[in-house]
Design a protein with these regions (language model features):
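Alpha-solenoid helical repeat scaffolds
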Residues: 1-276, 281-327
Length: 327
């Protein structure tokens, strides 16, 4: 400071160099007003200053939480650097992103993040850009951004994979979603728990890959706290004529509980038993269904189960008559 205060008494070159040094020292000592003052004076005396002092001023204003002036200096520094073809560091762009983020200026956050993913492709920039796209309702752009990051092998965390899979499901591309989830599970990025396995099973099922969905649902059902996944399995087994497994899954669902309508599961169980010609256990299942439906005031299923009971009673009588006639 003593040298600076000499003004015209010292050589101009020494004064300019000293001003810059004092500005930096003031910043290190957290004397931000002094840092601003000496750097501004330096800029007026320096010959054709580069972008660096503007980035310095932006950093000082950032420390002072004057984000408007920090943005002004950052943008000016970037303009100078671009005009001269000099480098703009990742740190510079990241600071500008933060400043616009604090201002909730989302169009500019997106603009700067687009530069970061292009010039400094890292997971954090890709995921942040995708997040802002999603926040602002640009779901297509969010999907394309996460897809690009996935293709470039930047996705690492569970949320990266599950967010991408969720967007693919929304876009009705379940087979792609299933492959993303499967990849995340294989990499151990996604935890192999009931929720994530159920998501994978649903994706395979919607992709018409039932043979792949079933073993995943079996694994998930064993981990789940309730019987809802077993319930889903019972329907899949019924549709594919695997009646023994259908009965096992329906029983598992009823044992674990937590079902929205247990009477519906009793119907599936009864149908699968009936298809194995196990009429007595099937009737028992439909009787349970009718009882629960009555308790729940579910007249529709109460009627359906009653009709099944009547039908089974007639079938039992018919089979008994045939057996007697043949005997």
């Amino acid at each position: 400071k003593i040298v600076v205060e000499q003004g015209e008494k010292i050589p101009e070159g020494l004064e300019v160099t000293t001003l810059y040094t004092v500005a930096q020292l003031s910043y290190v000592q957290e004397n931000y007003d002094d840092a601003l003052y000496y750097m501004e004076v330096w800029i007026t005396k320096a010959t054709n200053p580069s972008a660096a002092p503007r980035f310095f001023l932006a950093t000082v204003y950032y420390q002072m939480k004057d984000y408007n002036k920090a943005i002004e200096q950052m943008e000016l520094g970037i303009q100078i650097a671009q005009e001269r073809g000099t480098d703009i560091t990742e740190q510079n762009w990241s600071l500008l992103t933060f400043l616009y983020f604090e201002k909730e200026d989302w169009p500019n956050v997106i603009r700067v993040l687009q530069v970061l993913v292009e010039e400094f492709p890292k997971r954090e920039h890709w995921v942040r850009l995708a997040g802002v796209y999603g926040q602002e309702g640009f779901e297509k752009e969010q999907l394309y951004t996460l897809e690009a990051a996935y293709t470039a092998d930047f996705l690492e965390k569970q949320t990266d994979f599950t967010n991408l899979a969720g967007l693919l499901m929304q876009e009705e591309v379940p087979i792609r979603a299933a492959k993303v989830l499967e990849d995340g599970l294989n990499r151990k990025a996604i935890e192999r728990d009931a929720k994530n396995l159920q998501s994978l099973g649903q994706a395979w099922q919607l992709a018409q890959e039932v043979d792949k969905a079933i073993p995943i649902f079996e694994e998930a059902a064993g981990m789940a706290d309730d019987g809802k996944i077993y319930e889903r399995l019972s329907y899949l087994y019924l549709e594919s004529d695997q009646f023994e497994k259908c009965v096992d899954s329906a029983t598992g669902a009823l044992d674990k509980g937590g079902l929205r309508k247990s009477q519906s599961v009793y119907i599936v169980k009864g149908m699968c038993l009936f298809n194995q010609n196990k009429l007595s256990p099937a009737r028992t299942a439909f009787v349970s269904c009718r009882r629960v439906a009555r308790d729940e005031k579910d007249k529709t299923n109460q009627r359906i189960c009653g009709q099944w009971i009547t039908f089974i009673d007639r079938e039992s009588k018919r089979q008994a008559q045939l057996a007697a006639a043949s005997g």
